[in-house]
């Protein structure tokens, strides 16, 4: 797998990710580029200086910014490992469940939001959903190095398992209670549905409560990553008052 772009490569190095080598442009000389190269050298990483033509051929995103880190495949966490984040830090669990997000740019943006607002981990499905790839990592600006992500076979079964662990599950969908009026104390998870179809009916039935982002415009839907950002920020703010 390739990690592309300056922020993503820098955060991968800082997080201690397994990096086989760093491919670096032999023509880039700016301060930010040089800082990352020095960081890679300080970690004793292999650095291969190449021309931009080779970087362009190697790049999966077309936006390498002169740096590509060659790594092992992305390592997913387990749901238990996500739950252990809060347990080990003696705090309430805060988990995001994604029901069928297919766009890698949306997934990358969502991971970035989750890292900013202290989400313990993200749960995604194995089927009909985007996995963590080069575009996701690049769009996340390196947040994939810090947020635990679990890939599960059955989202609904996972929700039932979380509820058995005393995690209160909120579905973010139209027709629910105002998201701003809910008390989110205790362990909680929020479910965000897919870009085109929202959250499945069965999944919504399993949620303990449906919450809705209030809107006043004529268009009554939001991009999945935007909706996630609003929901996560709202819950984070209420949990930390």
Regions found by a protein language model. Give the residues of each.
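N-terminal positively charged helical leader segments and presequences
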Residues: 1-85
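Surface-exposed amphipathic alpha-helices with a cationic face
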Residues: 41, 159-163, 236
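Short hydrophobic alpha-helical runs that function as membrane-insertion/retention elements
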Residues: 48, 122-125, 212
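Active-site/ligand-binding-proximal alpha/beta "capping" segment
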Residues: 170-223
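Structured adenosyl-cofactor binding patch, chiefly the S-adenosyl-L-methionine
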Residues: 137-143, 201, 205-241
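RNA substrate-binding interface of SAM-dependent RNA methyltransferases
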Residues: 11-17, 84-177
């Amino acid at each position: 797998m390739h990690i592309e772009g300056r922020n993503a490569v820098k955060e991968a190095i800082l997080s201690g990710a397994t990096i086989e080598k760093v491919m670096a442009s032999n023509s880039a000389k700016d301060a930010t580029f040089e800082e990352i190269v020095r960081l890679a050298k300080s970690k004793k990483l292999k650095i291969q200086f190449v021309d931009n033509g080779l970087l362009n051929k190697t790049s999966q995103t077309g936006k390498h910014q002169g740096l590509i880190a060659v790594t092992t495949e992305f390592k997913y966490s387990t749901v238990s490992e996500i739950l252990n984040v809060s347990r080990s830090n003696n705090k309430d669990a805060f988990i995001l469940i994604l029901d069928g997000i297919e766009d890698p740019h949306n997934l990358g943006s969502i991971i970035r939001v989750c890292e900013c607002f202290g989400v313990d981990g993200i749960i995604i499905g194995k089927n009909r959903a985007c996995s963590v790839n080069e575009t996701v990592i690049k769009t996340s600006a390196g947040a994939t190095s810090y947020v635990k992500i679990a890939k599960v076979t059955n989202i609904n079964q996972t929700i039932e398992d979380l509820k058995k662990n005393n995690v209160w599950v909120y579905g973010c969908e139209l027709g629910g209670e105002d998201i701003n009026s809910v008390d989110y104390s205790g362990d909680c998870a929020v479910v965000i549905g897919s870009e085109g179809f929202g959250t499945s009916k069965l999944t919504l039935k399993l949620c303990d409560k449906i919450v809705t982002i209030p809107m006043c415009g004529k268009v009554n839907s939001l991009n999945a990553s935007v909706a996630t950002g609003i929901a996560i920020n709202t819950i984070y703010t209420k949990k930390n008052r």
